[in-house]
């Protein structure tokens, strides 16, 4: 399945929540009618079955992190293999993706933009160039912008937005050096309460 490149607002409306696919520190709710389904007249939401709820939650999380179905299923299998809560393990694996860490550090205004920076070899991990968006970052890894890429206007704009919004607690960033440290894998309490990972576990456990 190809990666979706259509209107980001449409995806957020379908899931009924802001998926943070667009740049900016403000929610898109003021621009996008989150409570209406896509379409000219925004059809009302029908009663959803248990399976439908599980499927929608999986699609929501998959779209937030920009992961295709095949890769998402592999993440679930790895999460299930590891000790602890499968749902929490899944979210931690997604949060440890290099493109997501670049986004969390404020070097990109969206995860899609972060994915481009990684793919275009603008990102280094511990001083070595890495161009794989799904690369799993470990606690203590130093993420930096390659020197030749530091003059990109989109990086400067992203850092400015990040300065307004603030960084998450599990990364430490020195914007003057264009680098940051992934201090630790976030706990479940650090992540969005708007995600019901247990619904995803129920879906894949069938």
UniProtKB/Swiss-Prot annotation:
Disulfide bond positions: none
Record-level GO BP terms: ribosomal small subunit biogenesis; translation
Any one annotated GO CC term: small ribosomal subunit
Highest taxon in the source lineage: Bacteria
Keyword Signal among record annotations: no
SMART domains: Ribosomal_S4, S4
Keyword Ribonucleoprotein: yes
InterPro entries linked: Ribosomal_uS4 (IPR022801), Ribosomal_uS4_bac-type (IPR005709), Ribosomal_uS4_CS (IPR018079), Ribosomal_uS4_N (IPR001912), S4_RNA-bd (IPR002942), S4_RNA-bd_sf (IPR036986)
Molecular functions (GO terms): rRNA binding; structural constituent of ribosome
Keyword tags: Ribonucleoprotein, Ribosomal protein, RNA-binding, rRNA-binding
Span of domain S4 RNA-binding: 96-156
Pfam families xrefs: Ribosomal_S4 (PF00163), S4 (PF01479)
Cited function: One of the primary rRNA binding proteins, it binds directly to 16S rRNA where it nucleates assembly of the body of the 30S subunit. With S5 and S12 plays an important role in translational accuracy.
Complex formation: Part of the 30S ribosomal subunit. Contacts protein S5. The interaction surface between S4 and S5 is involved in control of translational fidelity.
Similarity comment text for this entry: Belongs to the universal ribosomal protein uS4 family.
Name listed for the protein in its UniProt record: Small ribosomal subunit protein uS4
Source lineage: Bacteria, Pseudomonadati, Pseudomonadota, Gammaproteobacteria, Thiotrichales
């Amino acid at each position: 399945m190809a990666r979706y490149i259509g209107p980001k607002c449409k995806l957020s409306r379908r899931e009924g929540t802001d998926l943070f696919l667009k740049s900016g520190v403000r929610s898109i709710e003021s621009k996008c009618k989150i409570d209406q389904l896509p379409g000219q007249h925004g059809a009302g939401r029908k009663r959803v079955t248990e399976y439908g709820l599980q499927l929608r939650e999986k699609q929501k999380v998959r779209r937030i992190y920009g992961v295709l179905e095949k890769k998402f299923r592999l993440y679930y299998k790895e999460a299930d293999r590891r000790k602890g809560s499968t749902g929490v393990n899944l979210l931690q694996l997604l949060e440890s993706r290099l493109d997501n860490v670049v986004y969390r550090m404020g070097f990109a205004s969206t995860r899609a933009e972060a994915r481009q920076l990684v793919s275009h070899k603008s990102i280094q991990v511990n001083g070595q160039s890495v161009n794989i968006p799904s690369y799993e970052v470990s606690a203590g890894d130093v993420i930096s912008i390659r020197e030749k890429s530091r003059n990109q206007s989109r990086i400067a704009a992203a850092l400015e937005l990040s300065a307004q919004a603030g960084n998450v607690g599990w990364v430490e960033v020195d914007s003057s050096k264009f680098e940051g440290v992934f201090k630790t894998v976030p706990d479940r309490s650090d992540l969005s309460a708007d995600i019901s990972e247990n619904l995803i576990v129920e879906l894949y456990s069938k």
